[in-house]
């Protein structure tokens, strides 16, 4: 019979780092609220949630790398909002942030949940920050809780 590994939605005892971008703060603050809410609802101690604020989304991977390298965190949540404008800047930033966060997680072995919105409009970002499409910060936190527990069960 095969053996299955699954992560529980229990954040008790988990120490979580959150890296959140200040740019587009009217969106990212909602994502942050959602993430903290999810962590606390699932048993995390607020004292074990550490938040690093970075200027923009491009700086998220470096701060996440520093947190991961510290060995102090069970997981990290990356939160930001990159909204398409009239120049190719959106494409460069969203691509590099995505690649950077994935690289940090794979290289460090620390789970990093990607809660960086990459939307075509402000309206889409608002929808994903707690209105019509839920709160992607909340979802990122739930994902990281489950992933931490999954990896623990594999070990």
UniProtKB/Swiss-Prot annotation:
Top-level division of the source organism's lineage: Bacteria
The record's section on CDD domains has: Lumazine_synthase-I
Indicate whether Flavoprotein appears among the record's keywords.
no
Q: Quick one: which pathway?
A: Cofactor biosynthesis; riboflavin biosynthesis; riboflavin from 2-hydroxy-3-oxobutyl phosphate and 5-amino-6-(D-ribitylamino)uracil: step 1/2
Q: Looking at the UniProt record for this protein, which Gene Ontology cellular component terms does it annotate, in alphabetical order?
A: cytosol; riboflavin synthase complex
Tell me the residue numbers annotated for binding 5-amino-6-(D-ribitylamino)uracil.
23, 57-59, 81-83, 114
GO terms of biological process kind:
riboflavin biosynthetic process
Indicate what this protein is called per its UniProt record.
Answer: 6,7-dimethyl-8-ribityllumazine synthase
Species name? Pelobacter propionicus (strain DSM 2379 / NBRC 103807 / OttBd1)
């Amino acid at each position: 019979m095969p053996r299955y590994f699954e992560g529980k939605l229990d954040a008790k005892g988990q120490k979580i780092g959150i890296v959140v971008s200040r740019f587009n703060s009217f969106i990212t603050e909602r994502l942050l609220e959602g993430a903290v809410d999810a962590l606390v609802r699932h048993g995390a101690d607020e004292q074990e949630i550490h938040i690093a604020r970075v200027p923009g989304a491009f700086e998220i991977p470096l701060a996440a790398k520093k947190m991961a390298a510290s060995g102090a965190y069970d997981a990290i949540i990356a939160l930001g909002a990159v909204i398409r404008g009239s120049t190719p800047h959106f494409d460069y930033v969203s691509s590099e942030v995505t690649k950077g966060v994935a690289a940090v997680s794979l290289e460090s072995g620390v789970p990093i949940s990607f809660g960086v919105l990459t939307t075509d409009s402000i309206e889409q970002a608002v929808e994903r920050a707690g209105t019509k499409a839920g709160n992607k910060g909340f979802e990122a936190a739930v994902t990281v809780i489950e992933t931490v527990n999954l990896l623990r069960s594999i070990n």
